[in-house]
């Protein structure tokens, strides 16, 4: 493990990057291993940025941090709002906040396919996987003494759907919505005032969730975002069409 002074020397001699003698703390702040090494390329390691000075690395770090500061409250608002809209739609459809009732009445997208068909099996398996992920998320939060979960488990009461949502990641929430029936999807679309000609099946909300998921996670975990390296999937074309209208 190299000391900070050795790292500064390494940057000068190995990477030909100018480092001022008074920049030791700046290098500590951004970090050599997760800072400099993360900022030295665009999206993939083979697209290197030809830095010539540590000042340039520091400037890029500052820009990336300012982007996250700007975006963080907006993606958190979007996540919270979408969960609120879906809870409203689920409660209206299932007439219950009990998770088991919600699952039996509203998380039934698989029923729109012919029993025994390939899509039926695929969607049913997805639904069962979701249930396992929900149980794991609740167990994790219960073990971590999260009060919204412990309050119900410790009093042996059914956990309501709104408390479940507080334990789900955005990706798990996306799967929950994808497994919901058409009534839930169309009600959510109506709450969002989405145009029916572009969202006749109510699936655009699902595309919204997955579109913002990677950005939200990257910002929340303080990962690099300036080059969108966090993106793991493409944006659905229907969502793009909606944004362009």
Task: Give a label for each model feature.
Residues 222:
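Acidic/aromatic/glycine-rich contiguous surface patches that form carbohydrate-binding/processing clefts
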Residues 1-214, 226-245:
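Extended intrinsically disordered or low-complexity regions, especially N/C-terminal cytosolic tails and loops
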């Amino acid at each position: 493990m190299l000391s900070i002074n050795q790292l500064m020397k390494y940057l000068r001699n190995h990477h030909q990057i100018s480092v001022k003698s008074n920049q030791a703390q700046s290098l500590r702040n951004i970090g050599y291993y997760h800072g400099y090494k993360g900022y030295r390329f665009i999206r993939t390691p083979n697209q290197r940025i030809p830095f010539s000075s540590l000042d340039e690395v520091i400037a890029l770090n500052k820009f990336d941090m300012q982007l996250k500061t700007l975006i963080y409250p907006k993606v958190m608002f979007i996540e919270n709002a979408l969960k609120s809209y879906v809870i409203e739609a689920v409660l209206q459809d299932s007439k219950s906040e009990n998770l088991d009732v919600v699952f039996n009445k509203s998380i039934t997208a698989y029923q729109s396919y012919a029993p025994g068909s390939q899509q039926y099996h695929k969607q049913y398996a997805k639904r069962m996987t979701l249930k396992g992920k929900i149980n794991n998320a609740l167990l994790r939060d219960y073990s971590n003494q999260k009060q919204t979960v412990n309050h119900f488990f410790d009093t042996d009461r059914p956990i309501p759907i709104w408390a479940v949502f507080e334990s789900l990641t955005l990706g798990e929430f996306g799967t929950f919505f994808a497994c919901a029936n058409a009534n839930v999807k169309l009600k959510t679309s109506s709450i969002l005032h989405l145009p029916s000609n572009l969202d006749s099946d109510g699936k655009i909300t699902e595309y919204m969730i997955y579109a913002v998921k990677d950005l939200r996670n990257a910002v929340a975990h303080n990962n690099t975002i300036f080059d969108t390296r966090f993106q793991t999937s493409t944006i659905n074309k229907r969502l793009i069409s909606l944004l362009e209208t």
